[in-house]
Amino acid sequence: MKKSKSKKKAAKAQEVEVKEPVKEPEPLPELEAAEDLQDLPEPDPELLASEPELEDLADPLDLEGPLEADLLPEEGLLEEEEEELSLPKVSTSDPVRQYLHEIGQVPLLTLEEEIDLARKVEEGMEAIKKLSEATGLDQELIREVVRAKILGTARIQKIPGLKEKPDPKTVEEVDGKLKSLPKELKRYLHIAREGEAARQHLIEANLRLVVSIAKKYTGRGLSFLDLIQEGNQGLIRAVEKFEYKRRFKFSTYATWWIRQAINRAIADQARTIRIPVHMVETINKLSRTARQLQQELGREPSYEEIAEAMGPGWDAKRVEETLKIAQEPVSLETPIGDEKDSFYGDFIPDENLPSPVEAAAQSLLSEELEKALSKLSEREAMVLKLRKGLIDGREHTLEEVGAYFGVTRERIRQIENKALRKLKYHESRTRKLRDFLE
């Protein structure tokens, strides 16, 4: 089967080479490279990332990887993806299987095809600028209308991330205005449509790359579909930023953007209590340092050892605080055991409740107090209970007790002193209470 597939691909490649190039309109002025990628160096085979570096880049929380360091052997990776898509190793539902089947129908692109599509995308963006200047319409509106005419209005409504999604009426109005342009400007409309079609083709041909990367991040707090969705956003960003003149393989370039989009989504959405992205990077670095020290020492490193390895500005207290932030929250309703008849919260002690020993002692003390106070009059016993907080745990003032009985505060003081003298005089009544003081 593999040989027949390779023969078909070879025959298809020959057909592409034999076809005469389509006559293109007058070339547009060259665009300037994206500002945030100006410093990207030319790829050097001797500087390709080594295997340990690639393992670090694969860390699900590593957001620090430089763009030029993420040069992977993408040809082998994409061949593996083509086989893995039919039988994904992760748990999937029917919508995921259907999605994998659909994207598996799009053939992979050669380097020459990627460059050709990227060139058309770039020319299309420049053409949209020209149309915006000529018509006064917003560039984003023109781009979305052109996209809607290619994909269909129903599909454009489902595209996530658009600030304003044009309705069918707006699409037809703007499209009619664009079609009524002079002949010399219609050339730009044709180029813009070709650029949008090339953009869509470049995205669809690399959707399997997103799936391959997203599978490495399962179990991190986001569902598989959410990971794919976030990775697709990174892929779209990569298409917009790709510079074909540097002759990078697009899958190599897009890998960094896809990982970054997934990593940021995990940092923002996966936790119940959100942690800032910069703190996620710090936690990731701290975890790598702790793992490295554990391998070197053969034991769990102390906070002081980790702080020393982290460098200036770190101490044991900061290490401890950072590790506490990294802890995952656990629901009190999490089932425990195979039968799942108990919950995690059932095994957490309530620090506000007394221990069984303290509760038993408190019960015995209450009984002895009742016996001692039973020898006093009802009013004297109630005054002592209110003044000493034996009823509600709060010691009431003389004014409060006086208001309760409808007498003055001085009269309450007299009743209290008389009751205490009775208890002190009859020591046999209070002897057992003294045992609770020890």
UniProtKB/Swiss-Prot annotation:
**Segments for region (Disordered):** 1-69
Bias class Basic and acidic residues marks the residues at 12-26
Q: Where is this region: Sigma-70 factor domain-3?
A: 281-359
What is one cellular component GO term in this UniProt entry?
Answer: cytoplasm
The protein's matches in InterPro entries, at most eight in alphabetical order, are given as: RNA_pol_sigma-70_dom, RNA_pol_sigma70, RNA_pol_sigma70_r1_2, RNA_pol_sigma70_r2, RNA_pol_sigma70_r3, RNA_pol_sigma70_r4, RNA_pol_sigma_r2, RNA_pol_sigma_r3/r4-like
Q: Name one GO molecular function term.
A: sigma factor activity
Which coarse location class describes where this protein primarily resides? cytoplasm
Is Cell inner membrane found in the keyword set? no
- Map motif Interaction with polymerase core subunit RpoC onto the chain: 226-229
The UniProt record lists the keyword Cytoplasm: yes
Record function comment:
Sigma factors are initiation factors that promote the attachment of RNA polymerase to specific initiation sites and are then released. This sigma factor is the primary sigma factor during exponential growth.
Q: What is known of its domains?
A: Contains 4 domains, connected by flexible linkers. In the active conformation, the domains are in an extended conformation, each making extensive interactions with the RNA polymerase catalytic core.
Q: Which family does it belong to?
A: Belongs to the sigma-70 factor family. RpoD/SigA subfamily.
Q: What is this protein called?
A: RNA polymerase sigma factor SigA
